[in-house]
């Protein structure tokens, strides 16, 4: 009963932080558009007009707003998931559809928090809770990266660097608290998760893989911290990608040169591998003998 109660609390925290992450993703996009405009680069003018009100010069005006009508949102509009359900996915003030972006982020992070708690690989006691808290912070950064990549096909440096720093804190804490990190295995994990894509990026000059995926691989390599889980994470990312892409190519909904957001695949594959990667690796080794 206590375990279920704590899992529910983790889910609630996931909903709240998922709501926060969704709001920050829109603000990051707005800042990127402003930066592109100032630098004289091409940018989506319609999107710039819609998102620029999110960046107010005065702190008291920097509040969440409806992206359709610009109305400043009140407390009852910001309750994770409940506000969206109560208005049936529409703005309370202009009745325009809000979409599924925010509730999906909230639900995804809530599910990730709950699953992480329920199948956490080490006994949660004492400093283990600190390690778990840092893990949850890394998931917030990761869900923001996933959402940004899905929506705009780019992994911003601010988010990849932030995720990498949190991952570094996590692996250092894991080294001292759990004491299961081998430095040589960690180095190989970094080569697998980032180095492989770095080589592909250089060979293709950015046509096959984006530099953002290479940078994301650094953070994921630190989180996984072993060559076995890194190998499985990369394997799962490509396997999931094939499952999603091949039907699209067969039905001609996707073309050979279609741009695919690979960041979410890396994130999902790594999340699964963090918890069950060692078991999957054992299965792969056993299967290779038959």
What are the residue ranges of the model-derived segments?
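N-terminal signal-anchor transmembrane alpha helix
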Residues: 5-31
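Functional transmembrane core segments of multi-pass inner-membrane proteins
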Residues: 10, 126-127, 131-240, 245, ...
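Alpha-helical transmembrane segments of multipass membrane proteins
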Residues: 17-22, 109, 113, 141, ...
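Membrane-water interface at transmembrane helix exits
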Residues: 22-26, 30, 95-96, 117, ...
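Membrane-proximal soluble regions of multi-pass membrane proteins
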Residues: 27-101, 262
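Select subsegments of transmembrane alpha-helices in polytopic membrane proteins
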Residues: 99-107, 157
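Juxtamembrane "helix exit" motif at the C-terminal ends of alpha-helical transmembrane segments
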Residues: 111-125, 171-174
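Interfacial loop-to-transmembrane junctions
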Residues: 214, 247-272
């Amino acid at each position: 009963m206590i375990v279920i109660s704590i899992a529910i609390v983790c889910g609630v925290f996931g909903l709240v932080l998922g709501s926060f992450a969704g709001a920050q993703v829109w603000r990051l996009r707005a800042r990127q558009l402003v930066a592109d405009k100032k630098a004289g680069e091409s940018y989506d003018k319609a999107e710039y007009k819609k998102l620029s009100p999110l960046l107010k010069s005065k702190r008291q005006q920097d509040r969440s707003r409806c992206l359709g009508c610009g109305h400043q949102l009140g407390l009852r509009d910001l309750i994770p998931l409940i506000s969206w359900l109560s208005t049936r996915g529409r703005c309370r003030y202009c009745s325009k559809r809000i979409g599924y972006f925010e509730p999906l982020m909230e639900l995804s992070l809530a599910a990730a928090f709950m699953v992480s708690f329920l199948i956490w690989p080490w006994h949660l006691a004492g400093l283990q809770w600190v390690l778990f808290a840092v893990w949850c912070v890394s998931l917030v950064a990761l869900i923001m990266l996933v959402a940004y990549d899905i929506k705009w096909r780019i992994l911003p440096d601010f988010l990849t660097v932030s995720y990498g720093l949190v991952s570094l804190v996590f692996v250092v804490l894991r080294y001292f608290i759990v004491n299961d990190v081998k430095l040589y295995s960690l180095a190989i994990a970094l080569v697998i998760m980032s180095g492989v894509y770095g080589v592909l990026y250089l060979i293709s000059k950015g046509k096959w893989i984006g530099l953002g995926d290479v940078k994301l691989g650094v953070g994921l390599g630190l989180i996984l911290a072993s060559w076995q889980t890194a190998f499985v994470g990369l394997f799962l990312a490509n396997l999931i990608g094939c499952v999603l892409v091949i039907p699209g190519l067969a039905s001609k909904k996707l073309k050979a040169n279609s741009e695919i957001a690979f960041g979410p695949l890396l994130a999902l594959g790594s999340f699964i591998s963090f918890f069950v990667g060692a078991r999957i690796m054992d299965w792969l080794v056993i299967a290779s003998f038959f």
